[in-house]
Each structure stands twice: as structure tokens, then as C-alpha cells.
Amino acid sequence: ITAFLCPSDSSSNGELCAYAGGNWARGNYGMNVSPCHHGIQDNLSDGGFGAINSSIRIRDFRDGTSNTVAINELRAGLNKNDLRGCWAMPGLGSGTAAMYNDASRPNSRQPYSDDMENCAVSGSLGTPPMGCYDSQSTGQMTARSQHPGGTQFLMADASTRYVTESIDFKGAQNNCGPVEQRGIWQKIHTRNSGEVVGEF
């Protein structure tokens, strides 16, 4: 479906994902689960846009819908064995996005930043700029694009924004750390922490 694809991503070329039986379509957008935990959980307290088998109401966005990311841009996998962008899969980066530890700022080039199943088979193990770590869980993924210098995303109020790779990120804070120690990147990915974001 064209609306789910970014024309700037050279990997969004119609090649289907071969993971878990194959023939899965790819996309370039994923729901913001939370920047505060590893993997997909049904715990809504970490403040993303959604979680497994859960629903969120507008009143739950204490930080404001204009200050909370709903959808992050993702890059499709680099080959048919790379599950990133494969939206039917439950793993982060295939229909959702979470930023945690070394899966940090947009377009992170850390060699093991994306934790995902099938990483070694995909050929991206420890290989920047889309390096990954072979994880037996749903892992972690960061926002990615082929736009120069940053990524696009959709806020909870339906506005779109562009954020640069240099956005403030406190990568050392597991589980986001105390509110006062969070970077802007974490703040805009939580909805109910009472954070003041300011301009970004």
C-alpha cells in the first residue's frame, strides 16, 4: 500500500519479507510503544502511544497530543531476511518502534543498536549504519530514514514533524531514568510524565 511506504527508502521496493513463512509486505512507519523498556509489553505505564492488547484515550496524554509521538518513520529491511519494516510481525521495528540504550537517536549508527530476532541471518549483525544484535526477544529499534540528517514522524494530534539526528538524547538512562534526566527524544515519546518539552 503506497501510503505505508516512504519513496525515499530504497529498500521499499516491493520485496517481501521472508521471515516466519515469508510473503509479508513491508512499510516505513511504526507505532511508538515507549522509549523506556526493552521489547513489546502490555504495560501502558511507560507512556508510549500504545501497547499490546491495550487502548489509550486522548485524556491519557497528560503531556499533550502535540508533544507526544504516535508514529515513527522506519527503514525497511536491507534484504528479504531482515524483518525490519515487515508490519505483520510483532517485533519492534516491524510495526512499532522503541528507543532504549544503544537504539538511541534517529538513524543511530551504533553497530548493535537494533535488537531483533533473525539478525544474524539478515547479514546486518554489528554492521552500521543499520547494525543489529541477534535477540531472542522482540528487542528494540530506533527511528530510521534515508532522509538527510533526520526522520519524519507523526504526533498524536495528527501533525507531522521532522527531527534531526542531533536531537538531545540521554542514552545511558535505562528505563528512561528520572524525568529530569531525560533528553528531548525520550520526552516526546512518553505521553504522561508531566514533562516540559519546549521547542525541538
Q: PLM features: residue spans?
A:
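Extended catalytic-interface subdomain
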Residues: I1-S11, L16
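Short cysteine/histidine-rich zinc-coordinating motifs and their immediately flanking basic loops
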Residues: L16-W24
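Hydrophobic alpha-helical interface faces used for helix-helix packing
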Residues: N23, G27-F200
